[in-house]
């Protein structure tokens, strides 16, 4: 998944490297924190998860400091979390967006 944050494009990957990087940097379980971030809409956890899903040379703190606003991730939070959860938990299916309303017949 590609995401553009304040004019910079990043490629996100939800793979084994993502899980390992998260564990090494934040000493926490990425899958547990991913579910927590989704349920609590936790911006800091989402930033940590996003940072580990991209290939960034800067430290986490330097990466955060490179953005103009602390809310740079807010517009993309839901789509990033959905991408990451589908990548790490195969039992989760991405939501299909549809303009059609479902109807049932009796």
Where are the model-predicted features located?
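Charged interaction scaffolds used for protein-protein
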Residues: 4-9, 24, 28-38, 58-106
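Active-site-adjacent beta-strand anchor residues
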Residues: 12
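Short, surface-exposed beta-strand-loop junctions and turns on beta-sheet-rich folds
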Residues: 18-20
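Short, hydrophobic/amphipathic alpha-helical patches that form generic packing surfaces
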Residues: 45-55, 79-82
């Amino acid at each position: 998944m590609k995401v553009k944050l304040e004019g910079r494009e990043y490629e996100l990957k939800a793979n084994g490297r993502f899980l390992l990087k998260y564990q090494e940097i934040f000493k926490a379980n990425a899958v547990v924190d991913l579910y927590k971030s989704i349920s609590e809409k936790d911006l800091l956890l989402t930033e940590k998860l996003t940072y580990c899903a991209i290939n960034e040379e800067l430290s986490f703190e330097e990466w955060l400091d490179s953005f103009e606003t602390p809310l740079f991730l807010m517009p993309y939070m839901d789509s990033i979390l959905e991408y990451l959860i589908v990548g790490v938990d195969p039992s989760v299916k991405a939501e299909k967006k549809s303009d059609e309303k479902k109807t049932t017949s009796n």
